[in-house]
């Protein structure tokens, strides 16, 4: 019952933030007082922070909005282009606590339940990957520095205002309808905070995505648990249906089997973020692969920071 409510709430929230109807826009404006309080807290946090220099190059890839901006594939592209990175992230919805080394020089040390889905993408996508999950990024940075990191790549690190770093901010495509902070809009930080980014990454300008489907079948049903499934709209016409789950959702084999049966589908169409959680289920999966290439301008900027 709770899972079904969570799925419905996620669907409603996605519409509220990206495709609001009249009543949802009205609700957003009624919630403005709370958004103003939230914004004030964030601004105070930003300007009261004392930056610490860790004596190592740190590049943060973050965004101002709630998920779905393409940070993970961009981090993968950066790490592939510039070796020696230790990738550090929180490991959202993982079942482990504290600092955990997910991969060391390409050797995967944890399963996806302990690492979280995004950390496992890094571990499986990057040759000789070094990946750490930690609620406290400072502990992880010190560990990486001691273990030979050339530079640190912070996934979703913009909010760490007390860490001296080079901030890349990714602008989502599509962007939220209302440029307001939570709960009126999808912005975790005020839209004006783009001015604090050292580099603004925009898909189609600074980097480019190329997607294709591996193991395509005749009747695919799209099943995904990403923050903004509208980014997969180009694949909707190739599927017999679409089923969206909340971001980082923990699938069960039983519910996926039921979806296959109810749609009469021959395979599940999934992103890599979904696939790392279900690859051992023994179900037929068609995989959406994603490759990001960096513009020459972007490469020049990064080369100066590494």
UniProtKB/Swiss-Prot annotation:
Its EC number is 2.7.1.130. Transmembrane segments: none annotated. Keywords: ATP-binding, Kinase, Lipid A biosynthesis, Lipid biosynthesis, Lipid metabolism, Nucleotide-binding, Transferase. One of its GO terms (molecular function) is tetraacyldisaccharide 4'-kinase activity. It holds the Pfam family LpxK. GO terms for cellular component: plasma membrane. GO terms for biological process: lipid A biosynthetic process; lipopolysaccharide core region biosynthetic process. Pathway: Glycolipid biosynthesis; lipid IV(A) biosynthesis; lipid IV(A) from (3R)-3-hydroxytetradecanoyl-[acyl-carrier-protein] and UDP-N-acetyl-alpha-D-glucosamine: step 6/6. It catalyses: a lipid A disaccharide + ATP = a lipid IVA + ADP + H(+). ATP binds at residues 65-72. It is an enzyme of class 2 (transferase). Belongs to the LpxK family. Transfers the gamma-phosphate of ATP to the 4'-position of a tetraacyldisaccharide 1-phosphate intermediate (termed DS-1-P) to form tetraacyldisaccharide 1,4'-bis-phosphate (lipid IVA). This is Tetraacyldisaccharide 4'-kinase. It comes from Campylobacter concisus (strain 13826).
């Amino acid at each position: 019952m709770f899972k079904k409510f969570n799925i419905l709430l996620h669907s409603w929230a996605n519409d509220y933030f990206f495709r609001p109807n009249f009543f949802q826009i009205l609700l957003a404006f009624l919630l403005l007082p709370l958004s103003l309080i939230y914004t004030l807290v964030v601004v105070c946090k930003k300007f009261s922070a004392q930056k610490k220099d860790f004596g190592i190059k740190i590049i943060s890839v973050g965004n101002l909005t709630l998920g779905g901006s393409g940070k993970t594939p961009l981090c993968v592209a950066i790490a592939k282009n510039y070796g020696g990175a230790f990738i550090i992230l929180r490991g959202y919805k993982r079942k482990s606590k504290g600092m955990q080394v997910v991969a060391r020089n390409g050797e995967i040390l944890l399963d996806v339940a302990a690492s979280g889905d995004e950390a496992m993408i890094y571990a499986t996508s990057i040759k000789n990957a070094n990946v750490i999950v930690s609620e406290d990024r400072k502990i992880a940075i010190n560990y990486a520095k001691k273990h030979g990191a050339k530079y640190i790549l912070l996934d979703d690190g913009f909010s760490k205002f007390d860490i001296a770093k080079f901030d890349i901010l990714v602008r989502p495509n599509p962007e939220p309808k209302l440029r307001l902070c939570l709960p009126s809009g999808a912005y975790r930080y005020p839209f004006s905070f783009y001015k604090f980014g050292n580099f603004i990454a925009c898909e189609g300008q600074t980097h480019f995505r190329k997607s294709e489907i591996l193991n395509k079948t005749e009747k695919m049903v799209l099943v995904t648990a990403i923050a903004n499934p509208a980014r997969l709209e180009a694949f909707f016409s190739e599927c017999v249906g679409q089923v969206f789950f909340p971001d980082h959702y923990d699938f069960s084999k039983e519910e996926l089997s039921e979806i296959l049966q109810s749609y009469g589908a021959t395979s599940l169409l999934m992103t890599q973020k979904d696939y790392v959680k279900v690859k051992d289920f023994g179900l037929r999966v068609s995989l959406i692969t994603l490759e990001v290439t960096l513009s020459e301008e972007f490469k020049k900027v990064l080369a100066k920071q590494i």
